[in-house]
Amino acid sequence: MPTTLIFTSFFLALLGLSLQRKHLLSLLLTLESMALALYVSTALWALNNTSLPIMAAPLIILTFSACEAGMGLSLMIATARTHNTDQLKALNLLKC
């Protein structure tokens, strides 16, 4: 039961990621919800297995999730300062 709920939340976040293309902040929030679902599934998987290297996997995923959030917010601030908006339509990476 918990695994189906975790996979459902992951795929709903993936669906939201593919459908929500207006603001950069909403895109970052859906990425964070995907990372949270991945962290919870890895933590449950580590509880079932007793191997020592597997126990460190949730902490590694949590570390990468925090780095991803920090990089995403810094990119959002940089683009908001240069383009004066956080909408994804206004961003043209070929001009930068």
From Swiss-Prot:
Substrates-to-products reaction catalysed: a ubiquinone + NADH + 5 H(+)(in) = a ubiquinol + NAD(+) + 4 H(+)(out)
Entry membrane topology: Multi-pass membrane protein
GO cellular component term of the entry, any: respiratory chain complex I
Alphabetized InterPro entries for the sequence: NADH_UbQ_OxRdtase_chain4L/K (IPR001133), NUOK/Mnh_C1-like (IPR039428)
UniProt superkingdom: Eukaryota
Chief subcellular location: mitochondrion
Chain segments annotated as transmembrane: 1-21, 27-47, 57-77
Function per UniProt: Core subunit of the mitochondrial membrane respiratory chain NADH dehydrogenase (Complex I) which catalyzes electron transfer from NADH through the respiratory chain, using ubiquinone as an electron acceptor. Part of the enzyme membrane arm which is embedded in the lipid bilayer and involved in proton translocation.
PANTHER family: NADH-UBIQUINONE OXIDOREDUCTASE CHAIN 4L, NADH-UBIQUINONE OXIDOREDUCTASE SUBUNIT ND4L
Protein name: NADH-ubiquinone oxidoreductase chain 4L
UniProt source species: Petromyzon marinus (Sea lamprey)
